[in-house]
Amino acid sequence: MREELNVEELFASKVFTLGKMKERLPKSTYKEVKNVMDQGGELSLATADVVATAMKDWAIENGATHYTHWFQPLTGITAEKHDAFVTHPDEDGRMIMEFSGKELIKGEPDASSFPSGGLRATFEARGYTTWDITSPAFIKETATGPTLCIPTAFCSYKGEALDKKTPLLRSMEALSKQAIRIVRLFGNTEATKVLPSVGAEQEYFLVDSAKALQREDIIFSGRTLFGAPAPKGQEMDDHYFGVIRERIGGFMHDVNIELWKLGVTSKTQHNEAAPAQHEVAPIYESANVAVDHNQLVMETLKRVAGKHGLRCMLHEKPFAGVNGSGKHNNWSITTDNGVNLLEPGQTPNENIQFLLVLACIMKAVDTHADLLRQSASNVGNDHRLGGYEAPPAIISIFLGEQLEDVVSQLVETGKADNLKEGGMLRTGVSTLPDFVKDATDRNRTSPFAFTGNKFEFRMVGSEDSIGSPNTTLNAIVAEAFCEAADRLEGAEDFDMAVHDLIKEYMTEHQRIIFNGNGYAKEWEEEAARRGLPNIPSMVAAVDTLTTPKAIHLFEKFGIFTEAELRSRAEVLYETYAKTINIEALTMVDMANKQIIPAVMKYSKSLADAVIAITEAGGDTYVPNRMLQQITQKLTEMEKASEALLEEEKKASAMPRGKEQAFCYHDKVMVAMNALRRPADELEKLVDKKYWPFPTYADLLFEV
């Protein structure tokens, strides 16, 4: 029987919150820290020393002996180096535990050991981590013991961003600056900044760890590279929202406890559509904190899974034939005095501020659909997007019937006098209440959907950091706000000017709205007619980062320099090539050392059976037929393995960069698929006791 939980006491117990600062810091110090958090600026070194001492004392009280600058390099995961609080013993030989303001504010990791796209080399290795004061420090409890983790940004010696956080923070400042101009136009003089709020729904698979460790593909690539479909998949729709199995429920319970300790507002948990697939979702929070917390969610899922004898698979497509995993990025913008700029109110057709914000977002998404698509691209997501399980690779906006009708009225007549209502839902059961329906349905096929008072960006991959998507979203909307504010701030007749601007933006960018079925082939054709970009793969999307349009956008708002953009493009090309190379070599290894030898053993057993049956005077048609089929597929597989290895050698010998990445996409991936086909066919033919590793049925249904 579990002990009773006091969630209120447990929540954020391992976080150095504002409340703990208020208790432990002198009043003047706390006031300075709070002012820097709210208004920006730098802490004095004297103040940083006081904060560092208080933080260290709190951490030691919670069992920590070490601290780390916790940052997010371009690997997409987090990085940390642990330093103890110990200093040189005093003259009496006593150890003194210290932590200075300088150590709190700045660290110096080796920048050349992380992806930099040419910005750093081994002979110019210095990099800096700098404390993000707006994201609270926390204590992470792992097998190494409790460690004080200080969220930081990571940059080069020359100040170039080498991480996911620095551009995000820059984009948040840019968005706030431009959004404040918009709210000032409507008389809001109290707000001092506008924050993007984010809530990321995290999907994942859980499989038995002992079984997963028998498969090299899961170990090395995080997904299955071979595997015939199980007799049952997700076609019965019985896993989604189904009863959570006890083993999985115990895992989820422990995950919640760990996340609540870390201040992560884990709110919702449920089974997802595919067998062995699940989801956890938090409550929204400031974008930079949400990015940090999503990294903690992914780390915690993996760590707790191990304690339960499970393996958490975060790959976007770990199993062929069933749904992959995504990460719905719920995004809204809110003033510091509590006004959500995406709240339409009861009469959105009359809410001019909301309509202007909506028009600006339509303009932003239409103008920079290619960049938004790129922000959600990674190697794993290529297997998921557009696969009748996830949004297509074409960016469009779903507004729902009510708002689409408002937009249509404004475009056609310049005014929106009518508003579609939701009507009553009547169940026909006397004991069930009737209630007013929402004015619009949901569209699960849309990549960018308005869902009441936020936009849900559904393209993001499950394993990816949400830093890049939110950086891009903030940047493109900041640009649209800036252009709108430039037009309206000096207007002689503001009411007429804002009316005309809303109509202009909605007319010019109405093509980005699509409320239909994003999975339909007809949508691809319609999108092409509308002139919307359809970028099919990660490698094809990378170039969008270095177009003149993108460089102008990011440089204008101080989010990226051209050098930073080009370096990121190089990192993405290299990441793609390295990932596919690992997968290709893993496939060859599994084929030559596991599958082919296992099939040959089974073939021998069939041949022995033919001889025995012949000697007994029996009919050998069945074993002969089976042996013939298996031999044919085995020959096909051996040739495909040789061909894949040859393509891999050619690709790996090429200079790193765009051309190599495209070679892996166009040649190596094709060869990988050609090897998988006969292997999966053989799995269906070979006696299970001979097959060298667990099958889809073993992994997905024996958890």
Model-derived regions, located:
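Short, intrinsically disordered, low-complexity segments enriched in Ser/Thr and Pro
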Residues: 87-122, 237, 360-361, 484-493, ...
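Short, compositionally biased "basic patch" segments
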Residues: 1-8
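C-terminal amphipathic alpha-helical interaction region
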Residues: 505-703
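Glycine-rich, acidic/polar active-site loops that bind/position phosphate-bearing ligands
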Residues: 125-314, 323-326, 333-570
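Short linear, low-complexity motifs centered on an aromatic residue
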Residues: 76-92, 109-112, 117, 215-217, ...
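Hydrophobic/aromatic-rich, well-ordered segments within soluble, folded domains that form packed cores
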Residues: 64, 68-70, 291-307, 333, ...
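Active-site core of metal-dependent hydrolases
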Residues: 10-125
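Active-site proximal loops enriched in glycine and acidic residues that flank catalytic Cys/His/Asp
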Residues: 47, 71, 100, 282, ...
